[in-house]
Amino acid sequence: MIYQGKAITVKPLEGGIVELNFDLKGESVNKFNRLTLSELRAAVDAIKADAAVKGVIVTSGKDVFIVGADITEFVDNFQLPDEELMAGNLEANKIFSDFEDLDVPTVAAINGIALGGGLEMCLAADFRVMSATAKVGLPEVKLGIYPGFGGTVRLPRLIGCDNAVEWIASGKENKAEDALKVGAVDAVVAPEQLQAAALDLAKRAVAGELDHKARRQPKLEKLKLNAIEQMMAFETAKGFVAGQAGPNYPAPVEAIKSIQKAANFGRDKALEVEAAGFVKLAKTSVAQSLIGLFLNDQELKKKAKKYDEVAKDVKLAAVLGAGIMGGGIAYQSALKGTPILMKDIREEGIQMGLNEAAKLLGKRVEKGRLTPAKMAEALNGIRPTMSYGDFGNVDIVVEAVVENPKVKQAVLAEVEGAVKEDAIIASNTSTISISLLAQALKRPENFCGMHFFNPVHMMPLVEVIRGEKTGETAIATTVAYAKKMGKSPIVVNDCPGFLVNRVLFPYFGGFAKLLGFGVDFVRIDKVMEKFGWPMGPAYLSDVVGIDTGHHGRDVMAEGFPDRMAVEGKTAVDVMYEANRLGQKNGKGFYAYETDKRGKPKKVTDPQAYEVLKPIVVEQREVTDEDIVNFMMIPLCLETVRCLEDGIVETAAEADMGLIYGIGFPPFRGGALRYIDSIGVAEFVALADKYAELGALYHPTAKLREMAKNGQKFFG
């Protein structure tokens, strides 16, 4: 053994070739943490010092190669002073460069996935062999940063600027055949042949059949583009990528700038350019928010995994109420391998549900994400029915009938009599109390909420709602089923609106106040979209449905009268009375026309302004900053209350619920991280400036205490 550590070993194979193997003890995947980097330093030094070594193959002892850097270390590292962070980055890069500069040929054998630092390790090798089932990529832009272990330097010199920009700016994972096509790898082989192929390549290089130094040289030199070619390549790319990424996500454009700035330098000077840009991005609030979001997501997955021990296996599911929502649930279940009964009392409802599922599956086939055979298999997994005849074998039933407590209670009581005693029954209600609905059931311990968001196939969140009498098995089984469907479940305790809608309606309350002061809803939408929301509140109201919003507002007002009750008519009332229900009937805040692709396109409608005139109580001048504060303060304060009331257990769950459920701007990290970014004391002072607007703008006593003590929600 040439070197043995806790993450890396180097052992001799044959003919002077050694294997540098990554296998981080106690972890399911390999990652570049402090330990792995320090051991890589020691391993490279050991190889360099051993005159008997003639070649190196780099392998993984895990099912994946290396998933990248240890993101949990970013939080502390990125707090370091700029000079210290840059020095640490350059020190790490020196390890990769020293590996690249070894006198002997090096071959990386890529299995599973090689992402971020994992791919950058491979780029430092002379040759790369890839398993046919493996994927490679540089996803750092999704964390608000860019590759920091030489990715912006080596990749463009290896596969050309255009390809490198596409890989780095998109952050996508690339299949083996695509990597081979652009020259990122030298060979693709069957998984079982990977080790042998890498060894064979190393032997050929040792024998002089392949010139490893010639292969290495372009990575050490400046980019092979003249000044005009550089200008054409980089300026075009920056314009296109900036348009794709938008102004709130600077990393993709910064990556291109870094490649451009380093184009005329050799490797070592180019790495300094990369490090300077990396440090600049690491210090942005966007990077802090997106890294926080990633860590929150990991926390969510860990919490959901804990339920696996108690959960019952769901072999057969059922959905009550077909239509668009029921069809979406049936599609998602069948697509992910759980057959499902889809029941409705109307033939046309069943047809609508089947059409929805077939349409969604068809789109996946069109995009090449599903084979026709798999589509047929999924469709066969949806069994339409108008009776409870086959419900005796069902493990979980999702009720998705009309949002009316009496109707739901009747249907729930009916289905309870048709299923086996230990079957779980879940209601896809968006606002109705689970404890109230449970009153109709004989086995309330087997009942919980399972709130999907529309459209089901696109929205990742599922709220799993615990009622007063809900048992742990019901929660665990529903969480496990949601995960099996490819969703991100969050367990919340029962209250009007649960987490997401409870937080969303105060946001709409701020919107109502702005409209009452005569502020143009088109302007409000533009300001909130600029803030980072996928759509403004007027457009969102139209998409959700004015009638749905009207009903939800009434439920919330009844549940929280101290701050959500309304005096007099609001915009949603007059729109509802004028039968302007939004996209569903072609008119709401906006009017809707059908575009060339058959999709609704919003246009301004003078009639909407006429309808809104009676609700304007006074004309008030407001700035764009006021608009953001009117909207965001109530949303953030209600999120704080949900955490304080124990509706959610953790700040991470609260923030992820908003990002996954209503499209809260990811680069802002969630409502609680947004408060942290402003500063808790500063946020409380800001809210107090708007105190005259009512209780929605009044911070809680506990938040004031946090402000006084200099506390934060994260870190």
From Swiss-Prot:
Residues 1-190 are annotated as: Enoyl-CoA hydratase/isomerase. Its EC number is 4.2.1.17, 5.1.2.3, 5.3.3.8, 1.1.1.35. GO terms for molecular function: 3-hydroxybutyryl-CoA epimerase activity; delta(3)-delta(2)-enoyl-CoA isomerase activity; enoyl-CoA hydratase activity; long-chain-3-hydroxyacyl-CoA dehydrogenase activity; NAD+ binding. It holds the Pfam family 3HCDH_N. Involved in the aerobic and anaerobic degradation of long-chain fatty acids via beta-oxidation cycle. Catalyzes the formation of 3-oxoacyl-CoA from enoyl-CoA via L-3-hydroxyacyl-CoA. It can also use D-3-hydroxyacyl-CoA and cis-3-enoyl-CoA as substrate. Pathway: Lipid metabolism; fatty acid beta-oxidation. Residues 312-715 are annotated as: 3-hydroxyacyl-CoA dehydrogenase. In the N-terminal section; belongs to the enoyl-CoA hydratase/isomerase family. SUPFAM superfamilies: 6-phosphogluconate dehydrogenase C-terminal domain-like, ClpP/crotonase, NAD(P)-binding Rossmann-fold domains. It comes from Pseudomonas paraeruginosa (strain DSM 24068 / PA7). Substrate binds at D297, N501, Y660. This is Fatty acid oxidation complex subunit alpha. NAD(+) binds at M325, D344, V401, V402, E403, K408, S430, N454. The active site is at H451 (for 3-hydroxyacyl-coa dehydrogenase activity). The lineage of its organism: Bacteria, Pseudomonadati, Pseudomonadota, Gammaproteobacteria, Pseudomonadales. The record marks E120, E140 as: Important for catalytic activity. Heterotetramer of two alpha chains (FadB) and two beta chains (FadA). NCBIfam families: FadB (TIGR02437), PRK11730.1 (NF008727). PROSITE patterns: 3HCDH, ENOYL_COA_HYDRATASE. Keywords: Fatty acid metabolism, Isomerase, Lipid degradation, Lipid metabolism, Lyase, Multifunctional enzyme, NAD, Oxidoreductase. It catalyses: a (3S)-3-hydroxyacyl-CoA + NAD(+) = a 3-oxoacyl-CoA + NADH + H(+); a (3S)-3-hydroxyacyl-CoA = a (2E)-enoyl-CoA + H2O; a 4-saturated-(3S)-3-hydroxyacyl-CoA = a (3E)-enoyl-CoA + H2O; (3S)-3-hydroxybutanoyl-CoA = (3R)-3-hydroxybutanoyl-CoA. PANTHER family: TRIFUNCTIONAL ENZYME SUBUNIT ALPHA, TRIFUNCTIONAL ENZYME SUBUNIT ALPHA, MITOCHONDRIAL. GO terms for cellular component: fatty acid beta-oxidation multienzyme complex.
